[in-house]
């Protein structure tokens, strides 16, 4: 960066680098301008440069005039006269008391001479005028004013004159001549000076704007500048001295500012940019300018990523963080963080002067930038075209908003507004005046619009397919999202609303039969892309969808496979979205019930069952039959009678939950007896584990207590936690490792398998069976009609207000923690839960179906879902747990006691209790096996994981089965809850959600931490009792779902996801579904 500093000696040395004197001979004619009349001079434009110097006498030996050895200000005035008059000299003497302007960096302004430095911006080193050089021939002013299209190296800053050669530039400077700077003590004297020194025409030309000060003649087009100027008058009072620049219109009452202003015209040092024509006499300005080329932004905000090249910008930015608003409107109480806002306010509210008038309309403003933008709208209206539709915006911001609101599902490429092409338009005048130009413009626009329309057409079918068929690329189509939201909302409303949902989904599917087909086709295409052959692809998505939508898709799917797919997806999406929403809002159904009229817990569990599980109830009341169907074909699971059955089974489930297992529908009752035999089958492996179970005898009592704890929140992952808790309780030493194994392999797959089979055994039946079976498990696993101990958990209790639930949960958590601590289960739980969480995290993240399955499992959140190799049993323990937890600590204690008794009984009768629990784990493993058999082609990863897990799980699960049956719900809640939350959080990412969610239960930020005696366990509200062991002091608890996080980072991410869900539920659901579908395809 060549910076040229043109020094000038105070002693009057030459201004240029060489001491050689400029050859601008100054005779009595003064600058050889005697021939030019005053009118011919560029006096009005005499804004003598930032770069010019008046040079010495005729001898040229010195640049300074010394008269009487007194220094006086140089008087720059139009050169009509040959020399300065005595009166002018006297005027200069009056201002001599300013003591020279060397302090002002004007160098030495001698009598009748000013030493501004000529700056030749174009050249790195300005050429030196030789002493012998003759003045350039005088040329008419017209030539001086002419502008050449070529880049000219010599520019006069004040008047923007550009010269091609040095001679022209020197001549232009001489024409400017020396115009006097003078300072008057009063406005009257200045007025006289103006009258004597310049003509009215000149004054008019000097006029800078419509706003003029009556006291000193200051004028500007900036209202804020004018107001600031008036303050100077107020400060100075009546005896003010007005300092005025005659080269320009600058006027001030401050000597300091006046001297500072003079530097603009007579810079002592000039810093020139080597990359452009910029130059400045202020080093700070020059350095800031250089940063525009280098991109350096040294001033960074410590609170956000903002950075700036100027400190003033950073200072202004920091006000956005501090909220400081130092600028106040003079006419009202309006305050702002910067003066520009105040000026705008004054202009808009107080009707400040608006000198700029739009030639096309009545628009007026004082802001040039706004004026230009406004006029541009007349000339080029709506020049930003949407590449997707016919919409055209006048501003980029409007087009960007259009993208987000109208095309949220379009590829990100089209979202890049910076790449949006503008309409080809001519300049305003051409557009306004030339019809031909306008016609061409219209043609160009039409062609562009045609291209846009064609592009839109190409994209529209995709959109239609996406909307109708859940969009090929984005699994979460608008239609599926709508269905999801409607189902989730209806399910949240009530079981009746669930039936309405079923009808609605049926109506939707019936009304839009093509959409499912398209969705199927799109899904098949996606599957085909993911898999070489469509058959395996279909099988994979079908099986996965079976996992996800065996319960969900059955609601509205008449076709077992194709329709099942199309509807399974919407159903799965809806149900999964509902589960996600429910879980996000409140991992326990309790919270979801609050949202959806507190039927959501039921709806969460029942909504999915209603859509898929209830359908399954209608399809096959017997779990064995359902399992057989599942194993046989996922299409059988997607039978159309399911909607009717769902509508029926949902109320039945509601009744069952309220009345208990006894009112369970015959179909549900049948599955319960069928399940006991299933339990018996897995029971055989359990008896061998009974040995370990007795050692964990203390665990059983604790097992029931934990189930009650997690039960309220844990309807989501009952399947998986059940094995984890039993393993933690009964076989802590030997079972703990298997539990982790089972958790990673069996638990997540059981989640999927159970989810698959749970829908298959009919979730309503499972719910009722859960009520009956858990009662059997708690009281006596063999008798199906012993649910009284479990106390049929009324979902109405789940629907209790969240505050009451939290209070009851807190008391429960405290008691549970005490019980667990007394039993010593907390550490076991922690280790196993951690392992289970990891395992749950691993499977759910890669296979989206597992999260969906988890969400389906979530549907029976309130019920423990125990799955045997053939069928699944849903235990109302979770319901009872959450209900009791929500109801009262006494009930919780009673439930714990009953659970302990049942666990002891189960330990004594391992075949039964273990069978029931083993149903959860062995069922999960068996389900994994069955599902793996069904879905081996589609889900080899899950199947393999589930199958290897299944053999160890039956043994381990059965060992821990009796107490674990009761304890399983809480752990499952933790795991399933985490998985559900993962799905919810999976909206952003499926990976690591379990860890962050499970690791975070008991946050100080949640506000719930203080109320809980033991944050680790207490933080795991009912369903998080399993995770309670992990919770430690200082953790962060989510205020929405009470999930605890050990790391603030994870907690903040989780909280942000809740917020996103609150404001963008549909979009989030769509994204989640898309991710899940992608995973399925992969």
Swiss-Prot record:
Gene3D superfamilies documented for this protein: Classic Zinc Finger
Superkingdom field: Eukaryota
Region Interaction with RCOR1, annotated ranges: 985-1063
Organism of this sequence: Mus musculus (Mouse)
InterPro entries assigned to the protein according to its UniProt record, in alphabetical order: Zinc_finger/UBP_domain (IPR050688), Znf_C2H2_sf (IPR036236), Znf_C2H2_type (IPR013087)
Tissue: Expressed in the hippocampus, including quiescent neuronal progenitor (QNP) cells, transient-amplifying progenitor (TAP) cells, neuroblasts and mature neurons (at protein level). Expressed in embryonic stem cells (at protein level). Expressed in many non-neuronal tissues including the heart and liver. Abundantly expressed in osteoblastic lineage cells. Expressed in the spleen, kidney, blood cells, cortex, neocortex and in the utricle, saccule and organ of Corti of the inner ear. Isoform 2: Expressed in the cortex, neocortex and in the utricle, saccule and organ of Corti of the inner ear.
Modified residues (Phosphoserine): 950
Gene this chain is encoded by: Rest
The protein's name in its UniProt record: RE1-silencing transcription factor
Posttranslational mods: O-glycosylated.
Source organism phylogeny: Eukaryota, Metazoa, Chordata, Craniata, Vertebrata
GO BP, one annotated term: cellular response to glucocorticoid stimulus
